[in-house]
């Protein structure tokens, strides 16, 4: 869909730290009129507060309430929508909006299946020769348990559908593997998402995340990154949505980058085109650099979180124009430059996350942390203490992300941690080793 209007009212679907980072960039576009977040969060509600140039309003409408979202968009003179989270994408929100004549950034339901079903993505990779782990798909619990019980260890058990980033179990014993299968397929741990499982080999090597804009023809990979998914230092503890990210990833060499482009990124886009599922939006490649070459661990049909908070500040250009070009099929005409700086996003979480944690804890800041420390603070699990309040309280497991951009990775990591010392709430928790393995690799590369 072509957009000729100069000033655009924009709806951004989502309410986490990733959406805060995206909204902050969209608000900088000369074409941004009003921005509405559905639902938004406490920090987003104070973005550009009192500004006439680009007011930002949070609606409180849940990102999965598709009918309400469509009604809001149609009744509030919205010119462009950006659907960010996985659930509404997999549920087909972009299709619903486009059917109503609303230009929309994000893949169709047919394309979002690349994340919505791990069985689909594994079979796509097998069919088109895209390197990934050896695997089998099961819809029968007995067969899955039998296969897992005799698989070499460790073995990976994955729920087929969306599971908030927690649907992957790395089993070190056969008992753990069988338990994972039973929890998903018999115990309903992830509902319908676990009715089918993928059992696959365990791969070793550095992990790399690569986000890429694509309109189905042109692809623009963004700076690589390294997520830290485990809750505890030294990659211990439970899987989380992500406790911190550094970018670029020093393990992702120029040679690896070229190999991934030729053996993974381009073949994936070509495969989706061949299947009649052309992907337009932001495609996330979760990779492992194994001794036998790069392998795909997972695809996501959207911006990663917290990868976006670290990567987006390294992307130069008008994000709104990039999004418009992506949905219009004109990405080849869009100017996108990538910074040569480094970034670190440190996540501050509620104590007990990702399991049981308390909410409603007052968040305080020692002065203007963003201005004083030269960082960006992106709100994830926050809300206003009262509707008219300027105080924030915690409302989720991952509360804030602090992003520092500096000339070197070491400086970025140090700056993010220094800023975090000036943010306070009861039970505040963060890992103390974000970027540590990357710094070691960087020092080895640079002597």
Each language-model region and where it sits:
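A conserved helix-loop-beta module that forms one wall/lid of the active-site cleft
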Residues: 105-167
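Short acidic-hydrophobic, aromatic-tinged amphipathic segments that line or gate anion-handling sites
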Residues: 57-64, 136-140, 171
């Amino acid at each position: 869909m072509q957009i000729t209007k100069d000033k655009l009212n924009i709806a951004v679907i989502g309410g986490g730290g990733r959406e805060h980072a995206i909204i902050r960039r969209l608000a900088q576009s000369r074409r941004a009129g009003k921005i509405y977040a559905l639902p938004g969060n406490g920090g987003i509600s104070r973005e550009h507060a009192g500004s006439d140039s680009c007011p930002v309003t949070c609606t409180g409408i849940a990102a999965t309430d598709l009918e309400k979202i469509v009604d809001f968009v149609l009744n509030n003179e919205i010119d462009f929508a950006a659907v960010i989270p996985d659930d509404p994408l997999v549920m087909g929100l972009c299709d619903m909006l486009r059917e109503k004549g609303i230009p929309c950034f994000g893949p169709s339901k047919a394309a979002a299946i690349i994340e919505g079903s791990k069985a689909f993505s594994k079979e796509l990779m097998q069919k088109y020769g895209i390197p990934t782990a050896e695997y089998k798909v099961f819809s029968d619990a007995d067969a899955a348990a039998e296969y897992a019980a005799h698989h070499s260890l460790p073995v990976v058990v994955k729920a087929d559908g969306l599971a908030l980033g927690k649907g992957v179990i790395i089993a070190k014993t056969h008992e753990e593997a069988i338990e994972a299968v039973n929890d998903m397929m018999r115990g309903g741990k992830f509902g319908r998402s676990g009715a089918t499982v993928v059992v696959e080999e365990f791969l070793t090597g550095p992990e790399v995340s690569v986000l890429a804009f694509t309109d189905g023809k042109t692809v623009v990979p963004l700076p690589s990154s390294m997520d830290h998914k485990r809750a505890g230092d030294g990659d211990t503890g439970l899987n989380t949505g992500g406790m911190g990210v550094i970018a670029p990833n020093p393990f992702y060499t120029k040679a690896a980058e070229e190999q991934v482009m030729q053996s993974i990124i381009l073949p994936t886009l070509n495969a989706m085109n061949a299947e009649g599922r052309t992907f337009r939006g932001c495609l996330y490649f979760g990779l492992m650099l194994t001794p036998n070459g790069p392998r795909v661990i997972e695809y996501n049909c959207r911006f990663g979180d917290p990868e976006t908070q670290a990567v987006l500040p390294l992307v130069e250009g008008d994000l709104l124009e990039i999004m418009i070009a992506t949905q219009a099929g004109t990405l080849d005409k869009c100017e996108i430059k990538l910074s040569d700086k480094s970034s670190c996003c440190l996540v501050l979480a509620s104590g007990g996350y990702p399991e049981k944690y308390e909410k409603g804890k007052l968040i305080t800041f020692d002065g203007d942390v963003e201005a004083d420390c030269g960082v960006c603070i992106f709100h994830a699990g926050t809300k206003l203490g009262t509707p008219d309040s300027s105080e924030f309280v915690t409302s989720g497991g991952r509360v804030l992300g602090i992003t520092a951009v500096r000339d070197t990775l070491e400086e970025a990591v140090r700056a993010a941690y220094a800023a975090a010392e000036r943010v306070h709430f009861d039970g505040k928790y963060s890992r103390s080793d974000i970027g540590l393995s990357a710094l070691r690799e960087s020092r080895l590369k640079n002597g």
